[in-house]
Amino acid sequence: MSKNEINTNINIKDLNLWYGEKHALKDISLDIPEKSVTALIGPSGCGKSTFLRCLNRMNDLVKSCSIEGEVLVDGENIYDKDVDVVDLRKNVGMVFQKPNPFPMSIYDNIAYGPKIHGCSKSETEERVHKALDDAALMGEVQDRLGDQAFSLSGGQQQRLCIARTLAVKPEILLFDEPCSALDPISTSKIEDLILELKKDYTIVIVTHNMQQAARISDHTAFFLHGEIIEFGKTKHIFEDPQMKSTEDYITGRFG
């Protein structure tokens, strides 16, 4: 492999998606680099969150949704009929816009996934502690693991949700505007965490925050009207965009 080649483990080919009659994603083809952060940017309604949800088949939950094309994860089309969606979502974890802890203890939130996947008590405990460490939360909650998750601050709840996702040992992490409901200090902690996690995980993040995309992502895709207008290294997208619409969006002329 040449120095210019990049390993990818998510490969999208000719992806089209409809909600009823609405053509929401149009002929999307994209190769997402592994163990790096790819940001999806664009104005509201451009298709970036819809696209993100295609990567672990969350759109299956929308009755009016129909999809054509391929989404390959490690070479396997996740839309093949024989794909186990539960296993897929274990491998491709998602963290949502607002923290959504389960109504149970901090410990049980993280233990839930390993338990339902058949882990022993000792392995579950090991995974809980590692996930809390990896989510940079252990130091803040180690003496209160039995407390209700809702007793945590918003930023802590979001890191708890990240830890819960990590506990089932995914390969890929999807973030749908994970900081939009958080204060600047909590946002900074999440960003630092994402930069640390990319050493071991492929990360795709939807964000409306251009500064955030510039700070934490290695590559950026600009969406508009259900299409990818431009994709490349974040530095190039922000400093030397090739399309006028990309430049207009990044500089705040529309959005």
UniProtKB/Swiss-Prot annotation:
Signal peptide residue numbers: none
EC number: 7.3.2.1
Domain ABC transporter: 10-250
Membrane topology type: Peripheral membrane protein
Intracellular or extracellular location(s): Cell membrane
GO cellular component entries: plasma membrane
Annotated catalysed reactions: phosphate(out) + ATP + H2O = ADP + 2 phosphate(in) + H(+)
CDD domains tied to this protein: ABC_PstB_phosphate_transporter (cd03260)
Alphabetized GO MF terms: ATP binding; ATP hydrolysis activity; ATPase-coupled phosphate ion transmembrane transporter activity
Coiled-coil regions listed: none
Residues at which ATP binds: G42, P43, S44, G45, C46, G47, K48, S49
Any single GO BP term: phosphate ion transmembrane transport
Enzyme class: translocase
Domain of life, per lineage: Archaea
InterPro entries membership: AAA+_ATPase (IPR003593), ABC_transporter-like_ATP-bd (IPR003439), ABC_transporter-like_CS (IPR017871), P-loop_NTPase (IPR027417), PstB-like (IPR005670)
Pfam families: ABC_tran
Its job: Part of the ABC transporter complex PstSACB involved in phosphate import. Responsible for energy coupling to the transport system.
Protein family according to the UniProt entry: Belongs to the ABC transporter superfamily. Phosphate importer (TC 3.A.1.7) family.
Protein name: Phosphate import ATP-binding protein PstB
Gene name tied to this protein: pstB
